[in-house]
């Protein structure tokens, strides 16, 4: 019984109106489900589409049902037949012809047949076009062509389904907030609501072709909203590359952006792709297209493989040819290397024996220290040759002599050959420089090294023997060759008279008069002494050395600057330098003590600064491998000192740096660049300086840096605490720009992707925030005045280890004098003893941060005191010389005008040591760390001395004067690491500038103990405008120009990332990053604001970013920027804001509503009414507001938006869109406020005149909006009919387009039904005759072309008129 009841209920629920029985569900769409049905009267199978009536009004429902009744009259083999409709309380059921094989979209699924070949697609698309030709002739636009709406029978016949009704359902459902349905097939004009036409179906046909060929339509990899955006934005959808030329041309015609340029369906049927490929349907099905397609794929794969083999062979041949060419090419011959041309022709493999001979080429006028050291090292090397190497060395020597004899001048041949024997013996011990690797990597590197690392080629074995003469032999004639024996082309390279000269710069030829200056002067001095009756011989050689020192002191060396014991008499100092150099180098071994390694490293650093030529000796004889071994020692002091030594060696010498990279130094140094809790900041700084050299020295070193994963290291330097890590942040910014400027095949987008993946974007935004705060503070306090009329130059220089600012030739640094026991010296910088700094610094040698003599380079006080105590006297300045400047500091310390209270003046800490160690009571990190990074302490022409407060009270002084002087120093210096561009200062001027810096330093030291400003979490000092605490001083100390320069660089970097591909942009669209970026809109100056807005605009062009921008309240943050009315860059700012808002709000109703809620409509009105060039962005947004929401429409009405719409009817381009917006406002006019606005006489007259004067090409598009207007408002319908619209409608019935005729008949019917005097309308306009002519023309078939729906509509309207006439 229960089973029978269940069965009865089942059948009852499946029966529709006792006429159809519902079966299984066979499909599902946006507005309903499709079931198979059985006609209970005749047994026919039908398809029944079930549509919910929940969101459809009664009036719209009646219209849809009337449309279905009209479509029942259509009959064509390529369209699905409408059979009728049935309505229940909850659903509308549309009865359709059943097509048994289902849709093409279902057939091409991967689990079925998969994609179709072009031949089969041609068969199906030809039938689709046939169906469209019929529909368009009947005045019907399908509006939803896609694979799911193309059904097939088992005979292969194609039928178009779901035409006409689906779109009306969409229009009837005003609860939708965006374009719904199937966006991937939509034409741009459909998405933009600018008028649907028959050409919209042609666009959809193109999308369907790609769907059948690939299983998915264009942009299917995107979400629906981004896809809609791309359809509108892109010039054409992506077309697969593998298609034939004919089908590609066909698709390009379908995808014409302008709908008026697309061909109609009938024209496309005659396209070569369709015409050439059409064949009998059954024939095409008998021959499996899929099999043919697979065969074609296999054959094409074989061809590809053959082509690839040819490419490989071609590349291999090319490589062989390049190798042959390289092996035959001659290396450039420069200067002293001119006798090596034959050897240079050897292949790279020969360089294993001969490639290291570059050290034979140092000129005879090399400095004595280097020459004597060469002698000792060569002798020791010769003695240590192993027996196993003798045979090889002899062969090499004989071969070497054979090459060189023909090239060397005859009078030097014997000496040069003997010298080469000694040189090669030395190299065979293993101390040669790694030129072999350099050659294989870069021919330029070898040439540069031969120029940079030169040993005396003109000194033969005799000369080396004579250097070891007994002390009593003081004969000078054999020390130098006669001037006429010096080979031409030799250059004077050993001179270091200019402090900024580097080894590379020694390559340039010197004037002829400069050759052998040292020998000439020494000979002249000896001759003078002999003429005076004195002799050059002495038992102890003292007179000889005095003569040599006199010449050297004037010409080559500043002996007082050397780091040796000042108590040693001059006659004994010279040989001690060579001995000391050898001793220091020999101490650089892992088995030495920590103190010994550190001491030797720092002494070598000091020596290299005074004698840059010694670097070549060190590199030639030792290389970088011993230093790399020392870096493996897990001791901070050793690592710091060795890194400092490496930096000094490679400083400004690209060849040394490149060869250091070749032996693997980059990854090793990188390991010290990252942040670790137990790693001192000074080690990171040394590593950072080395990496900066890599970025700025040459493209080759930059490439090696990048290839060693250098970009993540640069990202790590963007520390959050900008005040504390300013140099590293600047390094990272400059380094990233160097990477981006690298001109290589690698795409810049790849670099962006690597950096973004490693978290650079959030760091850049935080840095932007910090720099903007720094710039703001500097602006509030007022930037420094420049006494000489020059403004501080914005720089992006290096973390120079020397901070050069003084020329050794012109002056020696001037410092505040202290008791001798309180200071030590190292190279040109001073250092406080532990006694002075113990109250503020830890003396722990494992924390080099605390021992910081020059602001950015580490020194170890306890070691340097021992290493450099011998040269204290060099830079001493008497107390009397500094009395005035020290007096000035007192008034500064008292803070008379700046509010710096003095507490414990006797214990004021040095400025830089103050920055390295925080007071115990301070809780906030980096409170005054800006001072530590004062521009000008970082990079100038000589090391700034350590600045620290004096115990003596100072008087006089003016803070503004000091800051002006300081800003001048800060603004100068190297530009991009070029030492030679730095200005020169006289001794007097430089002393004054140093005094100014010293006074600032002491004042900052005092202020730091009482400063009231604190740093934010990002390390930026926050202070009130006009504050007299430390913020004002810090703002001066950090040049506004410098901070602004880096602020712009960071903004430009963000812009680069915003322009990158979607993957990079996705990293930029995190919620926290965007929120932080938008917060800066009100904090930055217009130039930076414009760049941030450009970033936002670029992000908005990517559909995948729109949702993230919306979540970050981009619309809310952008709109206030439209309030800017005057000032710099206002137009550009408005342009970026409107463009971004346009991209965000286009298509999406929710975002349009959000924009309206945030007050965009008044701004849009202003741009439109003022006829601004930005009107192109404002108008679409303003018209979209009518479609957004009830609230947006209310705001439109309140701000006069309806009047703007009416005025746009005179604009040919915007008239159709404006009319559609008017129709939408009326359709949703609940309280009739919009209706009242349009019932005004002026509004009615504008609408009538617009209809009358509408251009022909727009006429078809305005009929549907007019139909909406008169069907939604009876009052406007009547008013328009009485004011001249009716005659215009009837007069246009002779239009030949079926779509136009059909809509005109609908309009006439709507007007007739609401007209107050229908009989008068019929008689005055002779309407029955007009309709009869339509029906008769249709019967003749001459003009109307079989327009079934037009005939049906005219006939039904004529019947209605006849009834009214009778009544």
UniProtKB/Swiss-Prot annotation:
HEAT repeats lie at residues 25-62, 86-125, 218-256, 538-576, 577-614, 633-658, 659-700, 704-742, 850-888, 906-943, 1045-1066, 1067-1105, 1112-1150, 1154-1191, 1196-1236, 1257-1280, 1281-1317, 1347-1367. Pfam families: Pkinase. Its EC number is 2.7.11.1. It is found in: Cytoplasm, Cytoskeleton, Microtubule organizing center; Nucleus, Nucleolus; Cell membrane. Induction: Expression is cell cycle-regulated, with higher expression in G2-M phases. The keyword Metal-binding does not apply. InterPro entries: ARM-like (IPR011989), ARM-type_fold (IPR016024), Armadillo (IPR000225), Armadillo-Ser/Thr_Kinase (IPR052441), Kinase-like_dom_sf (IPR011009), Prot_kinase_dom (IPR000719), Protein_kinase_ATP_BS (IPR017441), Ser-Thr/Tyr_kinase_cat_dom (IPR001245). Belongs to the protein kinase superfamily. Ser/Thr protein kinase family. This is MAP3K epsilon protein kinase 2. It comes from Arabidopsis thaliana (Mouse-ear cress).
């Amino acid at each position: 019984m229960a089973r029978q009841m269940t069965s009865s209920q089942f059948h009852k629920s499946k029966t529709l109106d006792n006429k159809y029985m519902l079966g299984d569900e066979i499909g599902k769409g946006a507005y309903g489900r499709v079931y198979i049905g059985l006609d209970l009267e005749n047994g026919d199978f039908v398809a029944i589409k079930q549509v919910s009536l929940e969101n459809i009004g009664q009036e719209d429902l009646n219209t849809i049902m009337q449309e279905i009744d009209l479509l029942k009259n259509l009959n064509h083999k390529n369209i699905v037949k409408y059979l009728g409709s049935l309505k229940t309380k909850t659903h509308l059921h549309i009865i359709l012809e059943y097509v048994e094989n289902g849709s093409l979209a279902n057939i091409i699924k991967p689990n079925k047949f998969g994609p179709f070949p072009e031949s089969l697609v041609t068969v199906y698309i030809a039938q689709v076009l046939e169906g469209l030709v019929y529909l368009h002739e009947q005045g019907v636009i399908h509006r939803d062509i896609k694979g799911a709406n193309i059904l097939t029978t088992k005979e292969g016949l194609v039928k178009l389904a779901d035409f006409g009704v689906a779109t009306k359902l969409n229009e009837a459902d005003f609860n939708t907030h965006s374009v719904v349905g199937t966006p991937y097939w939509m034409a741009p004009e459909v998405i933009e609501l600018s008028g649907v036409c028959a050409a919209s179906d042609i666009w959809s046909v193109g999308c369907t072709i790609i769907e059948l060929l690939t299983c998915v339509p264009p942009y299917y990899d995107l979400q629906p909203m981004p896809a809609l955006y791309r359809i509108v934005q892109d010039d054409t959808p992506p077309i697969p590359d593998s298609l034939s030329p004919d089908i590609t041309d066909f698709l390009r015609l379908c995808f014409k952006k302008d709908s008026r340029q697309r061909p109609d369906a009938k024209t496309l049927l005659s396209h070569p792709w369709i015409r050439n490929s059409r064949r009998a349907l059954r024939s095409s099905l008998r021959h499996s297209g899929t099999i043919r397609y697979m065969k074609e794929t296999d054959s094409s794969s074989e061809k590809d493989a053959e082509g690839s083999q040819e490419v490989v062979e071609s590349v291999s041949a090319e490589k062989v040819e390049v190798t042959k060419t390289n092996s035959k090419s001659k290396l450039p011959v420069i200067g002293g290397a001119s006798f090596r041309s034959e050897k240079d022709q050897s292949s790279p493999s020969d360089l294993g024996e001969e490639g290291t001979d570059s050290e034979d080429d140092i000129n005879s006028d090399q400095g004595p220290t280097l020459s004597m050291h060469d002698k000792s090292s060569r002798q020791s090397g010769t003695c240590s040759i192993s027996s196993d190497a003798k045979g090889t060395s002899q062969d090499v020597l004989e071969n070497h002599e054979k090459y060189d004899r023909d090239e060397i001048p005859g009078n030097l041949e014997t000496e040069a050959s003997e010298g080469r024997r000694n040189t090669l013996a030395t190299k065979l011990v293993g101390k040669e420089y790694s030129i072999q690797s350099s050659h294989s990597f870069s021919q330029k590197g070898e040439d540069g090294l031969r120029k940079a690392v030169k040993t005396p080629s003109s000194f033969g074995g005799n000369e080396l023997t004579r250097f070891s003469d007994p002390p009593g032999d003081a004969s000078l004639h054999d020390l130098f060759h006669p001037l006429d024996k010096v080979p031409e082309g030799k250059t004077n390279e050993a001179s270091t008279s200019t402090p900024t000269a580097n080894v590379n710069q020694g390559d340039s030829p010197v004037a002829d008069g400069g050759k052998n200056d040292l020998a000439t002067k020494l000979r002249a001095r000896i001759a003078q002494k002999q003429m005076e009756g004195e002799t050059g011989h002495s038992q102890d050689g003292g007179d000889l050395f005095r003569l040599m020192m006199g010449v050297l002191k004037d010409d080559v060396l500043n002996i007082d600057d050397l780091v040796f014991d000042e108590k040693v008499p001059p006659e004994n100092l010279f040989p001690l330098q060579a001995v000391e150099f050898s001793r220091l180098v020999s101490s650089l071994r892992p088995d030495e003590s920590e103190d010994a390694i550190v001491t030797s490293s720092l002494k070598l650093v000091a020596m290299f600064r005074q004698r840059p030529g010694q670097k070549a000796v060190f590199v030639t004889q030792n290389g970088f491998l011993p230093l790399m071994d020392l870096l493996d020692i897990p001791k901070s002091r050793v690592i710091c000192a060795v890194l400092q030594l490496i930096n000094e060696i490679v400083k400004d010498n690209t060849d040394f740096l490149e060869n250091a990279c070749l032996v693997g130094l980059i990854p090793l140094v990188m390991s010290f660049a990252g942040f670790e809790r137990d790693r001192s900041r000074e080690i990171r700084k040394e590593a950072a300086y080395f990496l900066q050299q890599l970025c700025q020295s040459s493209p080759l070193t930059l490439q090696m840096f990048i290839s060693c994963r250098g970009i993540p290291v640069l990202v790590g330097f963007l520390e959050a605490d900008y005040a504390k890590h300013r140099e590293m942040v600047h390094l990272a910014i400059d380094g990233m720009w160097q990477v981006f400027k690298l001109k290589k095949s690698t795409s810049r987008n790849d670099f962006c992707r690597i950096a973004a993946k490693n978290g650079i974007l959030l760091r850049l935004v935080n840095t932007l925030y910090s720099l903007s705060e720094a710039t703001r503070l500097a602006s509030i306090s007022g930037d420094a005045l420049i006494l000489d009329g020059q403004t501080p130059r914005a720089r992006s220089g290096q973390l120079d280890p020397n901070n050069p600012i003084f020329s050794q030739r012109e002056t020696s640094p001037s410092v505040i004098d202290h008791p001798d026991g309180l200071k030590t010296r190292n190279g040109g910088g001073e250092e406080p003893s532990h006694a002075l700094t113990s109250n503020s610094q830890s003396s722990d040698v494992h924390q080099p941060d605390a021992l910081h003599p020059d602001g950015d380079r580490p020194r170890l006080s306890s070691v340097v005191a021992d290493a450099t105590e011998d040269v204290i006297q060099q830079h001493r300045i008497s107390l009397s010389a500094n009395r005035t400047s020290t007096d000035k500091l007192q008034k500064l310390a008292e803070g008379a005008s700046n509010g710096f209270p003095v507490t414990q003046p006797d214990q004021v800490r040095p400025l830089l040591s103050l920055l390295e160690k925080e007071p115990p009571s301070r809780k906030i990190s980096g409170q005054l760390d800006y001072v530590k990074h004062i521009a000008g302490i970082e990079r100038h022409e000589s090391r700034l001395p350590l600045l620290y407060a004096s115990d003596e009270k100072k008087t006089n002084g003016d803070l503004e004067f000091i800051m002006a002087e300081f800003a001048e120093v800060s603004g100068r210096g190297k530009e991009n690491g070029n030492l030679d561009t730095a200005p020169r200062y006289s001794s007097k001027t430089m002393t004054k500038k140093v005094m100014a810096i010293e006074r600032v330093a002491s004042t900052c030291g005092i202020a730091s103990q009482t400063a009231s400003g604190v740093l934010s979490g990002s390390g930026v000092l926050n202070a009130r405008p006009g504050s007299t605490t430390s913020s004002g001083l810090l703002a001066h100390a950090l040049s506004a120009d410098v901070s602004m320069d880096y602020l712009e660089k960071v903004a430009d970097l963000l812009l680069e990332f915003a322009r990158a591909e979607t993957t990079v942009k996705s990293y930029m669209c995190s919620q926290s990053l965007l929120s932080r970026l938008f917060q800066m809109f009100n904090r930055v100056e217009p130039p930076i604001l414009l760049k941030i807005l450009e970033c936002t605009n670029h992000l908005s062009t990517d559909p995948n970013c729109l949702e993230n921008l919306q979540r970050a309240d981009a619309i809310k943050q952008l709109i206030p920027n439209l309030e800017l009315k005057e000032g710099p860059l206002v137009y550009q700012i408005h342009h970026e804001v409107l463009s971004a808002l346009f991209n965000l709000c286009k298509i999406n109703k929710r975002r349009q509503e959000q924009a309206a809620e945030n007050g965009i409509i008044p701004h849009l009105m202003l741009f439109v009414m003022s006829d601004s060039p930005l009107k192109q962005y404002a108008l679409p947004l303003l018209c979209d507001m009518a479609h957004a929401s009830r609230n947006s429409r209310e705001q439109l009405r309140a701000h006069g938006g309806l009047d703007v719409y009416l005025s746009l009817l005179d604009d040919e381009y915007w008239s159709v869109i404006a009319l559609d917006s008017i129709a939408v406002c009326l359709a949703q006019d609940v309280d009739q406020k919009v209706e009242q606005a349009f019932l005004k006489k002026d509004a009615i007259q504008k609408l009538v005149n617009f209809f009358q004067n509408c251009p022909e090409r727009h006429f078809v598009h305005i009929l549907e909006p007019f139909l909406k207007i008169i069907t939604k408002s009876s009052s406007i319908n009547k008013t328009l009919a009485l004011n001249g619209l009716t005659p215009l409608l009837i007069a246009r019935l002779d239009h030949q387009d079926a779509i136009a005729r059909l809509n005109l008949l609908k309009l006439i019917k709507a007007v007739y039904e609401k007209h107050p005097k229908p009989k008068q309308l019929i008689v005055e306009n002779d309407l029955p005759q007009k309709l009869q002519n339509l029906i008769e023309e249709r019967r003749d078939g001459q003009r109307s072309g079989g327009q079934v729906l037009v005939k049906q509509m005219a006939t039904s309207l004529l019947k209605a008129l006849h009834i009214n006439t009778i009544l």
